[in-house]
């Protein structure tokens, strides 16, 4: 019996074959995948659903955003939200462009009418710069220890209800939320499985994010329905190494997977190279039945070449199945199961996408909406139970997408041949498809112009796509009107570099850039450029001379300004670049931007790994954004040097370097470290954020021996980065006292301090400081770092009383959570030094009495430690209110959520940063 609700797919799979598995490879891990049975997945998701149901933002039947960067989290929380009776809405990866990212989050909030998103602690920073959506870190929900829900809220759903929200391609534009019902999804899965039967004891293979309709429906849900295993791998690992893709298919006896045309070409090239090697690899692909291919045009020659190669390893000749589908049709719904023979027989340069599966119908119409006979080009329209019914909260887009008689207008053009096979012939709407991903040309143009690139005239930028003869995927072409003189070659090169950087960060693809004179960029009477006319002129070759001259001038400029490596580090990096790009030193030097060699996102990933191997990193530790922002060997060498070079003691730690407002300075708590501020700083994007870190952590450093010593060091550190005010300083707990003292010193020297913040510390602290000996400091540190629980720290305080430091240290290491200890990369010597730093900080404050006044004070108060006050009101009114004695104006109090140790932790940092930013604004900062 066919299930009617999506949760039934998992429940049935868990009951029918509890050993069916989800197999997951993490980034860079090719040897030791994680495996979770369908039975265990149901239990895990059921536990997580309790946390969703109990969250303060929970509303039955509402949409819940999911934003994760790995398959396991997406899968678990997809089911958790469904089982809690809500609608999962899986977000695509956010843009690297901060402006686009914030705009997208605000758009998601207004579209879904939601103000929260489940995510991971590692991704909290991606929600910076906006207040529309609060990120909720799943690590803070404590769901692992919950009991599985006895029954699920989802059983109340009806087959026609929305089960899942997926977003149309909107990497650079405003995406639409597609409502996919239980009935629609189940109908689509049944239709897909009927097209090509799959063998038992085989598996599905997915390598794209679960936000993509092909991953969540065509692989994850269909595998459950078919009672087969499913394998999920990171896309970057597969795309950069097609041979591993073949290894995976052989290892896991994959019967169904997918690959767009560009990746089919990479697999073909890898197999050709393998055949030429001295010891060619062999694979058993006899279980492979179905390599679905779509998202961009498939060349018949590529499909034919690869089909022949795969056939030699046991796959059927028609294993590559070009098709057509959209998010609105639950991915592929029209399939060509006779490729490449059918396409060769009919002399097609680009393959047909075939005929409809059960559950969908197609027609091709003219401009009046009348169906056209075979062979005539028109608009492709679809209908049937597999086709969606509406975009969420967007009636205008929904109405525009359907004909009066209820057919969905795909926006694509095509013809039906005499056999009812569909041959696509372009898109009615302006869309760019790069490596199977859609982008809006208008939004790319906007991103370029919003960067105010010197050398580019605003409103004369035009972006479009073009598929060159013999190419496997489209390229982005961008033409613009320059402001520089034609003979200003440095400006010409700098403008091209700036444009390339913006487009690469937005799309992962390097654009083909051509500066044109204004006569070639005519505007309409409404002041608009005609993208279609400009594209047609480009494809007719009318810009070929301008393009050739531009390339030649920039190449000569690079040659004339060629630079040699300054040191061995630059030399080593240059060799990696040359080897990765397979170019000579005549073509590339330490100051050549990587965009100049035509690098794309896949080659960038390969370059990143080559550099990591050269530097001896065991794991992928260089953030990709480092390569995107530092595009020459020289820039990258400097950036890596700053990241990893040991430094002499400097109290200043740069947590966030960007923004045009005056910096915010944050002073460490009693532990001396500034790690606690990292998540907070990520949300403050309009100003630099610096932290002041205590002395004594590095070998050979001595901790501060007095408050004056620390204040002088911090004062000098502040002045070295920010010579002039107005200043904004704040401290967490113990750091509040130091922030107050540094503020006084600044004012004494004639500077304006406009903001002083105390994060939950009263002015009088010496009695508490005297209570904390070395053992207590270490126990507080262990609890603060989540190595032990607060309860256990109090028990150990008694058990370890009177013992020597070495014994105490070893006892706490033995008690520590081993996974957390390893996660923090702790060692016995470092933990001992850390305890020394914390103890010395408390010791030097044992006689501290506050005196003097600062202009103002903002106190951010949370639930206090039990030892400090009996209630929050007592804490504020009796203890914290004493700051009034040390300010020249009344203290402003800010009630913040959480407890003393969690107020700026992952669970509460989003709310805290909103209150902090508001307080800064109220002080004129």
UniProtKB/Swiss-Prot annotation:
Domain notes: MelA has a A-T-TE domain architecture. The adenylation (A) domain recognizes and activates the aryl acid substrates, and loads them onto the thiolation (T) domain. The thioesterase (TE) domain shares the missing condensation (C) domain function, and is responsible for condensation and final product release.
Adenylation (A) domain, as annotated region: 11-434
InterPro entries (alphabetical): AB_hydrolase_fold, ACP-like_sf, AMP-bd_C_sf, AMP-binding_CS, AMP-dep_synth/lig_dom, ANL_N_sf, PKS_PP-bd, PP-bd_ACP
Organism: Aspergillus terreus
Gene Ontology cellular component annotations, sorted alphabetically: cytoplasm
Protein location: Cytoplasm
PROSITE patterns: AMP_BINDING (PS00455), CARRIER (PS50075)
Region (Thioesterase (TE) domain): 663-923
Gene Ontology biological process terms in this record: fatty acid biosynthetic process
Positions of modified residues (O-(pantetheine 4'-phosphoryl)serine): 601
Top-level taxon in the UniProt lineage: Eukaryota
GO MF term (any one): phosphopantetheine binding
Every Carrier domain range: 564-644
Keywords: Cytoplasm, Phosphopantetheine, Phosphoprotein, Transferase
Induction: Expression is induced during conidiation.
Record EC number: 2.3.1.-
Name of this protein: Aspulvinone E synthetase melA
A Pfam family hit: PP-binding
Principal EC category: transferase
Family label: Belongs to the ATP-dependent AMP-binding enzyme family.
Free-text function comment from the UniProt entry: Nonribosomal peptide synthase; part of the gene cluster that mediates the biosynthesis of Asp-melanin, a pigment that confers resistance against UV light and hampers phagocytosis by soil amoeba. The nonribosomal peptide synthase melA converts 4-hydroxyphenylpyruvate (4-HPPA) to aspulvinone E. The tyrosinase tyrP then performs hydroxylations of both aromatic moieties of aspulvinone E. The product of tyrP is highly unstable, and, due to the high reactivity of methides and ortho-diquinones, the polymeric Asp-melanin forms spontaneously.
Knocked-out gene: effects: Results in white conidia.
SMART domains recorded: PKS_PP (SM00823)
Main location: cytoplasm
